[in-house]
Amino acid sequence: MQSWPDPEVPKLSGDSPALRLYDTADRAVRPVAPGPTATLYVCGITPYDATHLGHAATYVTFDQVNRVLRDQGHDVHYVQNITDVDDPLFERAERDGVDWRELGSEQIQLFRDDMTALRVLPPRDYIGAMESVDEVIEAVEKLLASGAAYVVDDPEYPDVYFRTDATEQFGYESGYDRATMARFFAERGGDPDRAGKRDPLDAVLWRAARDGEPSWEAPFGPGRPGWHIECSAIALNRLGIEFDIQGGGNDLIFPHHEFSAAHGEALTDSRRFARHYVHTGMVGLDGEKMSKSRGNLVFVSVLRRDGVDPAAIRLALLADHYRSDRMWTDDVLATAVDRLQRWRTAAAAPAGPDAAPTVARLRQHLADDLDTPKALDAVDAWCADVRTGIGSDPAAPAQIARAVDALLGVVIA
């Protein structure tokens, strides 16, 4: 599937410190130590609605990871999926009286437009679930053959399930106890009460064909892929086992990332699917959790339509640490708009303080678990010096503008 245009990223001189990120599985900030090619997998959208700020915060975060790794000299093999076959898409299409394929296509294009506006670097591989069905079928066949999966005893709907006990290490990624797993499994798309399952937490690999749902032929019966195995197959077939970073929002820690890891590990007889599991916090609105049920989602496309500069949206999302849950308010956006104006005014100045120390601080803060608040503060400090007339280097404003573009994805000149 086509992604979106790749913005030009300025090349900076000098060296960048090694990137360190918090790993959910190890509960610690650890160095990311890729080879010449860094490998990154980020779970994509289910295209039944427009890109809201929670989505945007996640993709901007991993764009920061991408930019830091590139600045360190790595080639980055970035893979992102699209869950273009799933219940929420069917339900929204039925509600709106449209074909689910048309709805998915429209929302994917809107997502592309939003990512382009936010200057998010596109993935090298942008893969839809429908594109990967053959890969999923092959993976499910292997899991059935190894005993890691089973078919429920249901002549009408012989779904295929993954055994939670198929890997000894199941649960290491989230670190959750059984009760927490059970709660999140029920809340986040699981089916603990499905008759015929050997364990309430066993996750569906292949949903047998139902009336009114798309299906594909498979040796174990017609149906469609489960959510978790899609990501396992897509990642393994493009990045291999133990790729560098698996990323997404913290609502994906369990069950999605736990099971996609377990599927991949069972398929390859490996202990670890990814070297780092990295998760972003949630975005709320005016003191409340942002959710579809509350009807308080803030959409990037609506902000853009209302004339908000996408660079200001990006700066607003970078103002808090990526792992923190944060609130979106009018004041947050106003602060970002003001900051963007101050940065652009300073970048247009005829001269300013030497850029090298500020660029070094930018790199240092971003390498330290993406400390974007401190990175923004470093640019703020340079701009404040320009306003007070400190510094006489005529090359500095352009150098700062290049660094802000390359490292933060924000154009100020």
Curated annotation (Swiss-Prot):
L-cysteinyl-5'-AMP binds at residues 43-46, 58, 81-83, 227, 249-251, 283. It is an enzyme of class 6 (ligase). GO terms for biological process: cysteinyl-tRNA aminoacylation; mycothiol biosynthetic process. One of its GO terms (molecular function) is zinc ion binding. Keywords: ATP-binding, Ligase, Metal-binding, Nucleotide-binding, Zinc. Its cofactor is Zn(2+). A motif ('HIGH' region) lies at residues 45-55. NCBIfam families: mycothiol_MshC. This is L-cysteine:1D-myo-inositol 2-amino-2-deoxy-alpha-D-glucopyranoside ligase. The lineage of its organism: Bacteria, Bacillati, Actinomycetota, Actinomycetes, Mycobacteriales. The gene is mshC.
